[in-house]
């Protein structure tokens, strides 16, 4: 923020505590299961093997947000050994993580997600993912980045055996 007074230029700084977290998740693919990514149902013959709905993008994002405040990971908060979380919509898990961040006096700043998946192509769904995640995170759509890539048919992703996702997030204490 800048202020002019009596032709003098003053610079003032707003001090906020900013923290950064990173997350990663991977899920195997199997025939006949639903594919959820970034809170959006993706038309596909395969989907994710998981205890919850398998939304690997939201899981990586949750871990990034939790990591920013050293609050563990989603496996600790929502263990796959508990029937309470069986088949749960991952958007609910994300909302719980965002609430937990708020309880610690922080809010989400921005997030960046990279999805590695050979097929289906995700480009037609990326904006919808951003628009789905933004209100849950309490940020504008332009604070949510979702990108997709392939592994050029290399590794388990390239063989269409699974999907991996990396996420980064900033949280801010005003």
Question: Where in this protein do the model-derived segments appear?
Answer:
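RNase III-family endoribonuclease catalytic core
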Residues: 17-127, 137
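Glycine-rich, mobile lid/loop segments that gate access to catalytic sites or pores
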Residues: 133
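Mobile acidic interaction elements
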Residues: 153-155
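Short, positively charged and aromatic/hydrophobic N-terminal segments
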Residues: 3-4, 9-12
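Short, low-complexity, polybasic intrinsically disordered segments
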Residues: 126-130, 159
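Short acidic capping loops at alpha-helix termini that bridge into adjacent secondary structure
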Residues: 140-143
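C-terminal edge-of-domain segments
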Residues: 157-174
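Pyridoxal 5′-phosphate
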Residues: 146-150
């Amino acid at each position: 923020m800048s202020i002019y007074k009596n032709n003098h230029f003053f610079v003032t700084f707003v001090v906020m505590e900013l923290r950064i977290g990173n997350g990663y998740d991977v899920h195997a693919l199997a025939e006949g299961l639903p594919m959820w990514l970034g809170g959006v149902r993706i038309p596909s013959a395969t989907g994710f093997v998981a205890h919850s709905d398998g939304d690997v993008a939201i899981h990586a994002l949750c871990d990034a947000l939790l990591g920013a405040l050293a609050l563990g990971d989603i496996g600790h908060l929502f263990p796959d050994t508990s029937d309470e979380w069986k088949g749960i919509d991952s958007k609910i898990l994300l909302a719980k993580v965002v609430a937990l961040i708020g309880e610690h006096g922080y809010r989400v700043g921005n997030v960046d997600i990279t999805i590695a998946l050979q097929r289906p192509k995700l480009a037609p769904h990326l904006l919808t993912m951003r628009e789905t995640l933004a209100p849950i995170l309490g940020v504008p759509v332009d604070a949510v980045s979702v990108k997709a890539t392939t592994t050029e048919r290399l590794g388990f992703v390239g063989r269409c055996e699974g999907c991996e996702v990396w996420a980064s997030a900033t949280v801010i204490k005003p």
